[in-house]
């Protein structure tokens, strides 16, 4: 596990985009696993900027998103489908046929989950999977006590997760209670994993990810067993770690 600590969120976002961009240049038809939430927004802004400057090309890229709320239409402005188009896909030259997001409105939800994993396998697998992390160490929507072997599935959201996401809705009652998520078994198949974390509220989860016991109670702890994981943190998210744990990135870049 490689750990990179950046001065602030702007530097974290730039570093994450550089790693994704390097993967795209090295392999123009890369398969990217993408995440939602507030943490990767800065990375997406940097990727858009790199695209506009002609540094990267999305025309042959395939993407798979980690998760989507269950029973929330794609056109709802709080759906992850809407989020991804608003924050990335509408601003780049990606082929929309190569964009994959779980269908939260599927009539046969179990079949949708199986189909999603099959599409990932048929794509030759995810080259680099972007993850955020919850305060309770969830990755995707894999909540504590998750079965580590699970593929894509429907999950009942932890109350702490719903409260954390309530800021995006008018009230807690509007936050969906279920979601479709790639399971830790699906995530673990990715060739490389890039986990981003910003803020002191993520520090305990990060410490347990790196130094804690590998247990379903800490879903992200399974990453200790993956062959190629990079954690990109800002100083606040890293403050419980020892300086011997990580390398430091000094540069700061603001996205206008």
Give the ranges of each region predicted by the language model:
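N-terminal glycine-/serine-/threonine-rich phosphate-binding loop
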Residues: 1-32
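ATP/nucleoside-binding phosphotransfer catalytic cores, i.e., glycine-rich phosphate-binding loops
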Residues: 189-256
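A glycine-rich beta-strand to alpha-helix segment
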Residues: 30, 38-39, 43, 118-144
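Class I SAM-dependent methyltransferase SAM-binding "motif I" and its flanking Rossmann-like core
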Residues: 136, 140-184
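A glycine- and small-aliphatic-rich helix-loop capping segment at beta-alpha/alpha-beta transitions
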Residues: 46-57, 80-82, 144-153, 214
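Ligand-binding beta-strand-loop-alpha-helix segment within the catalytic cores
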Residues: 56-128, 245, 250-256
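Glycine-rich N-terminal segment of FAD-binding domains in flavoprotein oxidoreductases
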Residues: 26-52
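Short beta-strand segments
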Residues: 33-37, 65, 102-103, 130-133, ...
């Amino acid at each position: 596990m490689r750990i990179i600590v950046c001065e602030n969120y702007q530097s974290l976002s730039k570093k994450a985009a550089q790693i994704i961009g390097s993967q795209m240049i090295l392999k123009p038809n890369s398969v990217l696993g993408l995440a939602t939430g507030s943490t990767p927004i800065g990375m997406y802004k940097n990727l858009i900027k790199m695209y506009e400057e002609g540094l990267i090309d999305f025309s042959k890229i395939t993407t798979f998103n980690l998760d989507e709320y269950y029973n929330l239409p794609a056109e709802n402005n709080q759906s992850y489908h809407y989020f991804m188009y608003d924050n990335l896909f509408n601003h780049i030259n990606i082929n929309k046929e190569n964009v994959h997001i779980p269908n939260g409105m599927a009539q046969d939800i179990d079949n949708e989950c199986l189909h999603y994993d099959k599409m990932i396998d048929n794509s030759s697998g995810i080259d680099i999977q972007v993850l955020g992390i919850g305060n309770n160490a969830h990755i995707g929507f894999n909540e504590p006590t998750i079965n580590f072997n699970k593929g894509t599935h429907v999950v009942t959201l932890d109350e702490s997760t719903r409260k954390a996401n309530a800021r995006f809705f008018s009230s807690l009652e509007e936050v969906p209670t279920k979601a479709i998520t790639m399971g830790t078994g699906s995530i673990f198949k990715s060739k490389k994993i890039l986990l981003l974390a910003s803020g002191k509220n993520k520090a305990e989860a990060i410490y347990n990810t790196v130094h804690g016991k590998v247990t379903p109670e800490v879903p992200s702890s399974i990453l200790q067993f993956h062959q190629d994981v990079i954690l990109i943190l800002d100083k606040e998210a890293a403050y419980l770690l020892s300086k011997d744990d990580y390398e430091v990135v000094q540069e700061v870049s603001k996205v206008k």
